[in-house]
């Protein structure tokens, strides 16, 4: 395989380039809070996130929904069948956390692409490894009973995965509503609004056009320790 195909290129871009010879990729858009797939849906396509953020959550019998990952641009998801080698139904609830644009392809054609271009497997493994790490961090975040600690932990995860350097700190490059944050950490909009207000008063964060800037992540991490 030509190394220029995979070197320093997002996985979605690689599959888009391969599209003419291997698969007809489909580009879809979803508004915020729209479901991409439900638990139990047939696992028929693999998704590559082009723009925005996608929330993966696990839904339990009691109706409780726990966020396990927040995917950023260039992430791949819906790949459980590829990993196990067996056809299976969807395990997670995938929802557009922001307006998103996705590239999707039939799972059979992705399997064929991986067979013909083995280097793609390494790219996919790297992406999955990053997601496993984030899932562990999300579980630790939701283990906090105190909502202030949950919010701070969540903001630090966002800094790591969506943060860009800014003159006054790290700007989380997502437009986040208070409701969206509340849904991600298992809280309420009213509580999140109050807690964000406290952090602003303490000069820990600032918010401009729904984008949060964390002025000092280290200082923020010490707020609820």
Swiss-Prot record:
Pfam families: cNMP_binding (PF00027), HTH_Crp_2 (PF13545). CDD domains: CAP_ED, HTH_CRP. A nucleoside 3',5'-cyclic phosphate binds at residues 9-131. GO terms for molecular function: DNA binding; DNA-binding transcription factor activity. It comes from the Bacteria. Residues 177-196 bind DNA. Residues 145-218 form the HTH crp-type domain. Keywords: Activator, DNA-binding, Transcription, Transcription regulation. The keyword DNA-binding applies. Required for full expression of proteins subject to ammonium repression. Transcriptional activator of genes subject to nitrogen control. This is Global nitrogen regulator. The gene is ntcA.
